[in-house]
Amino acid sequence: MVVEADKKALICSFCSKKQHEVKKLIAGPAVFICDECIDLCTDIMKEENKVALKQITSSIPTPQKICGILNDYVVGQDQAKKILAVAVYNHYKRLEYIQSGNNDVELNKSNILLIGPTGSGKTVLAQTLAKILDVPFTMADATSLTEAGYVGEDVENILLRLLIASEFNIAKAQKGIIYIDEVDKIARKSENPSITRDVSGEGVQQALLKIMEGTVASVPPQGGRKHPQQDFVQLDTSNILFICGGAFMGIDSIITSRTNHSSIGFAANVNIDKEKNNSEILKSLEIEDLTKFGLIPEFIGRLPIVTTLDELDKEALITILTKPKNAIVKQYQKQFELDDAELVIDDSALETIAEKALAKKTGARGLRSILEHLLLDSMYKVAELKKQRVTITKEVVNGLVEPIMTSLISTKSNKKQPIIADIPA
C-alpha cells in the first residue's frame, strides 16, 4: 500500500528518508520501505547470485576430468559416465552463459533420466557428481510423493530438502542437483490417460512438470501441511539440474515386442531373442517405449537426456568390493581397524559373495547386506577382544564354518624364557 497522508511524518525504516524525498513509500506491519531501498536490495541479491554462480562455474572440471573422478568411485558404466559428464558440464556452462548476459541464443536445460537395474550405480553416480561440483544435493524417493491435497509428500518438499542441504542459501540452492529415485514407480497404471484420479502415478508426474522445467516455486520452510500459516520461500528452479533414476522392470519386454518383427498379436512371445541380455535390449530404448511403460509425454519431454546402465557381472561386483576409493571391503576393514582388529577376506570368499549378489539380483546394493550379515558376530566380539584378525573364507560365506578369529598379539610374548643353569666354576 502506498501511503499518501502525512508525508512529513512518514520515513523509510531502512534509510530514514522522508516520504516526500522518495518516489514511493511502501507500508508494512509497523515498518516502511522506499523504492530506493527496494532497488538496493534487488541489486544485492543479484550480486549474491553472481558470486554463488561464479564459485561453481569457475571450478567446474572438463567432461574428461569429471569422468576420471567418477572412475574412482563407480565401476564400469563407461557410456553412462561419459553422457553424464558432458551433460553436467554443459548444464553449468549454460548457467555461466546466462549470467554473462549474452543471451543471443537461448540454451535450454537438459535434465537426465538414468535407466538401469537395481544396484547398477544410478544413485552413486548422482551423489559423486554433486561431490565433484561441490553443489547442494538432495535425494527424493518418487514412491513417497503424491499430488497436492492427498496423503503423502508434496513435490515442494523435495525443494525444501535442497534448501536444507544448502543451509537455506537460496542462491546456492538454485544451482543445486536433485536426484529423484524410483521414478518408474510413478508410471500411470495404463497406457491410456486415466479417467479417475491417479494421485501417486500420473498425478505426481503432472506435479513434477513445472519444477523440472523451471518455475518460481513457493517452498514451505517448515514443511507444507503441519504449518499452513508460515511464510513461503520463493525458489527459482530454472537452473536446478534434475536427475531421475529407475529400474523400469518390464520395459525390456516392451522394447523386445517393438523390435521383434516376427512377433504376431498381443499374445505373442516377446522373449524369442534369448541370447540378448537386458543391458543389450535397453540400448534399443526409444521414447515410445517409455510412453508405453506409463510415463506421460510431457514428463519425458522434461528429461531430454536418457542413458541406460549395464547389469553388473561377477567380475564387476568383485571389483566394486575391493577397488574403488569407497570400496565396501575397505570400509569394513577401516571399521575393524578402529577396534584394533584386522579383517581379511580371501579371493574365493569375494567370488562367492559376488555370486550370491548375482543370484539375488540386487547388484552392488546387495553386496553390503551380504557382508553385514557375515561380519555381524565378528564385529560384536572384536570390540571386546581387541587385537584380533578375522578371516573370511569361501566356507564362511557359504555358512559351513564361523569366521576365523586369531590373535594379533606377537607370539614372542607367549614364548617361555630359557632357563639358564648355574655352571660351577
From Swiss-Prot:
GO process terms (BP): cell division; proteolysis involved in protein catabolic process
Pfam family, one: ClpB_D2-small
Keyword Acetylation: no
Residues reported in the UniProt entry to bind Zn(2+): 12, 15, 34, 37
Entry similarity comment: Belongs to the ClpX chaperone family.
Protein's name in the database: ATP-dependent Clp protease ATP-binding subunit ClpX
PANTHER family, A to Z: ATP-DEPENDENT CLP PROTEASE ATP-BINDING SUBUNIT CLPX-LIKE, MITOCHONDRIAL, ATP-DEPENDENT CLP PROTEASE ATP-BINDING SUBUNIT CLPX-LIKE, MITOCHONDRIAL-RELATED
Domain ClpX-type ZB residue range list: 1-53
Protein's organism: Rickettsia rickettsii (strain Sheila Smith)
Keywords: ATP-binding, Chaperone, Metal-binding, Nucleotide-binding, Zinc
Binding-site positions, ATP: 117-124
Coiled coil: none
